[in-house]
Regions:
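An amphipathic, aromatic/His-enriched active-site/gating alpha helix that lines ligand/cofactor pockets
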Residues: 90-119
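Short, well-ordered beta-strand segments in beta-rich or mixed alpha/beta enzyme
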Residues: 38-43, 75-101
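A short linear hydrophobic-aromatic micro-motif
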Residues: 71-77, 110
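Short S/T/G/P-rich N-terminal loop/turn motif that feeds into the first structured element of a domain
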Residues: 18-68, 74, 119-124
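Short, structurally constrained coil/turn elements
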Residues: 16, 69, 105-107
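Positively charged n-region of N-terminal signal peptides that target proteins for export
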Residues: 1-5
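Bacterial N-terminal signal peptides
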Residues: 8-19
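Residues that form or immediately flank small-molecule/cofactor binding pockets and catalytic motifs
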Residues: 45, 80, 113-116
Length: 124
């Protein structure tokens, strides 16, 4: 499995900040012109059982690819579930998202553009 190779390669130097916006609340309608928000569904059997060290290695690989690709693509955060990882990225287009996945050896089973975000505050 190609993805397994990512877990056993030597770790890249830790990049402390993959995205200038990481940890901040970002809404698609407030993005600069030409930037779009995407949710990437990555089917990874056993994802929820990955160790902290394995997740760190995956994050380091992703950040290394992002650094190589430049500031037009940014990783905001990811959600790890039983057999999937859902990642939120900013990029000018879906092709750049898929290029990142290919370069990092990550699956990108579905890439969906986010049109808006709702939360409990939406009900107020």
């Amino acid at each position: 499995m190609k993805f397994a190779k990512v877990l056993i390669i030597p770790a890249l130097p830790l990049i402390l900040c993959c995205s200038a916006l990481a940890g901040e609340s970002v809404k698609p309608e407030t993005l600069p012109e030409g930037q779009h928000m995407y949710v990437i569904e990555r089917v990874i059997p056993g994802a929820g059982k990955l160790t902290s060290a394995e997740l760190k290695g995956i994050a380091q690989t992703s950040c290394g690819v992002l650094k190589e690709m430049g500031p037009k693509i940014q990783w905001l955060q990811s959600y790890v579930t039983g057999d999937k990882i859902f990642c939120v990225y900013l990029a000018p287009n879906e092709e750049m998202i898929r290029e990142h996945a290919k370069k990092g050896g990550f699956p990108a089973n579905a890439v969906s553009e986010v049109s808006t975000i709702i939360s409990p505050k939406t009900a107020e």
